[in-house]
Amino acid sequence: LNPDMASLRASVAAFRPFLEKDLRERHGIEPLAMYVYPAQVLFCKQPLTRLADLAGRRIRVSSTGQADFVEALGGTPLRIQFAQIPSNLEAGHTDCAITGSSSGHTLGLHRVTQHLYPFPVTWGLAIFGANKTAWERLPADLRQLLGRELPRLEERIWTAAESDTAQGLACSTGARGCKLPSKGRMTLHPLSSEDERLRLAILKTTVLPRWLQRCSMDCAQLWNSTLGAARGMALPER
């Protein structure tokens, strides 16, 4: 759904009003900020020039949505803990791993894989919130201070996540823009227009329909009134 940071910002802006209202009214949480982590990309041992090359490969994933995406490409998704990714790759239990571009480099995946595909399969998002009752008991001036400063912190985190995504790619491939002492020699394979079309097709035919099957509420209507409207992707409502 979000092939770049600009798309992710648009998606969050479309869904955030519902999310914040639901957190307050249903869960008693006052949402204060939303953070993002660097893009989740593909580290592979074998050459990877297009998404179709993932067919038949065993690929580490960290979410159900990622697993649906991999299965649609003909790959086998495997749930493996983050710290165990290198050993599984070295032992031949997995062929590729989907993880953060920055955290993957920190973990040393540039030492056990040779090919890097920078397509953001997913992004990690986190919410910073407070118990609503406790929040309302805070002094008004403190709430005003937090309400003013936390959005600034949020924006700095988003900017850092975009920078860290680029740094992870640069350092794993040994590009000149890398600012870290550890540099890899991975081959970077850019996203093609063919893969952009395939990404959208899988989202519409596999990832979204499976998500809709798992959802316990009328998610089609929610999707259509938020993300679907913003991104031009309507789902059939029940």
Predicted features along the sequence, with ranges:
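N-terminal secretory/targeting leader peptides
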Residues: 1-5, 24-238
